[in-house]
């Protein structure tokens, strides 16, 4: 009872905090001068991280196993992973382009886990025999880490496509449209303002130079993040194959989850291969990564909706009483 109460408090603290953070984040996109608010949003992300970490530790202690046995726990772990990705640029002392991706992703994941699932699905369950293995932590954590990383990389690629083609659609060309102030559009305005200030200098500045700088940075970040995610996905699939051989006597069974994991791996392998061709860099490779975004959600959620196959214990079915 004590652990259940603690988990309830921590999940709602983390969700409330991240909701405030995303509000502050949107305000700072609209008003760049409010630097104090930007610092507050970072402190809020730290508070969210510790709340989610506290929940995972509490669930681990109370259940006696790593908290990755059902959809609810995996979503909480996914939001925790997104925060880890949020901190990587800060560790490297580089511009945090990922924050515009990771912050909304964290609140959506946390919000769905907290409010979108039935309360009965929040309960910790006894592991089925197939999950009573040390491979649980290695395989499932690697898969969720890869999902979070690949989703962020795919969204960066989608941002690149939106920025490059926004002038092709009247929806994006409206000067007062709110979308200009979200995602990376505020960065574009800053770069264009900077370009205007340099008009009277002797340096050559062509019209789309700063927009080009931004898209190149997005392309670079997307490639680096997806490369990391692809590595994690490969490790996760290999761990799952070894575990499957121990549990079911076969490395690969073409279970629906396994099939879509293979499709996901193939899509991002194509993305990485396309990067070796200069003609496919940028827009074309970003298109492949954007397709991968949809494939990941099919692999993670779509198969769970069906509730069939060897991975049915991760479905939306309610725990047995």
From Swiss-Prot:
Listed NCBIfam families: cytochr_II_ccsB
Database matches in InterPro entries: Cyt_c_assembly, Cyt_c_biogenesis_CcsA, Cyt_c_biogenesis_CcsA/CcmC
GO biological process, one term: cytochrome complex assembly
The keyword Plastid is assigned to this record: yes
Localization per Swiss-Prot or TrEMBL: Plastid, Chloroplast thylakoid membrane
GO CC field: chloroplast thylakoid membrane; plasma membrane
Transmembrane regions listed in the UniProt entry: 9-29, 44-64, 68-88, 143-163, 225-245, 259-273, 288-308
Taxonomic source organism: Saccharum officinarum
Lipid biosynthesis keyword on record: no
Domain of life: Eukaryota
Family under the similarity heading: Belongs to the CcmF/CycK/Ccl1/NrfE/CcsA family.
Pfam family, one: Cytochrom_C_asm
Assembly: May interact with Ccs1.
Membrane topology term: Multi-pass membrane protein
The name this protein goes by in its record: Cytochrome c biogenesis protein CcsA
GO molecular function, one term: heme binding
Keywords recorded for this protein, A-Z: Chloroplast, Cytochrome c-type biogenesis, Membrane, Plastid, Thylakoid, Transmembrane, Transmembrane helix
